[in-house]
Amino acid sequence: MATRTGQERVGSELRTTAGWPLTTIVLIHLVISLVHGAAHTGARVSLTPAGAMFVYIVILAGPLAGLGLSRWRPQPGAWLVACSMAGALVFGLINHFIIAGADHVGHVAAAWRSLFGVTAALLIVAEAAGTVIGVRQATRRARRTS
């Protein structure tokens, strides 16, 4: 049963239903990231060990961990999504659009350039949206509990 406050009662447990935007953006980001990873592989654009660790921990695991945490601890979970998405946004902007290197959209093999460039741009949009949604969810919950 839904209530007016964005919560629903499931048995004796009251769950927040306002988390669907967070769930949606995290899943969209994951799909785009996987397609972008395939473009990296196809174009033979490898990352440094530090870059690969950042991708696996911050860009892929961070939003998923935040989403999982948000089920039981909504505010810290939303903050984890927001911070990991913000970190991913900065990483992607710098590596795909600013620094001239193998990971720059203009330096990828021609056969993969379109997919690589489109997914890099979509990641920027998804990560910006994820940052905003995460902050809004976290601060909304903080205001309700104060």
Spell out what each predicted region is.
Residues 1-29, 133-142:
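Cytosolic juxtamembrane helix and N-cap/initiation of the first transmembrane helix
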Residues 95-116:
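Membrane-helix boundary connector in multi-pass membrane proteins
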Residues 31-40, 83-102:
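C-terminal TM-helix exit segments that contain a strictly Trp-centered aromatic cap at the helix terminus
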Residues 39-49, 98-105, 133-146:
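Juxtamembrane transmembrane-helix termini
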Residues 61-70, 132-135:
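Alpha-helical transmembrane segments in multipass membrane proteins, preferentially the mid-helix core
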Residues 109-129:
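Individual transmembrane alpha-helices with interfacial aromatic-anchor signatures
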Residues 67-93:
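Loop-to-transmembrane helix junctions at the membrane interface
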Residues 19, 36-62:
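Transmembrane alpha-helix entry/boundary detector in multi-pass membrane proteins
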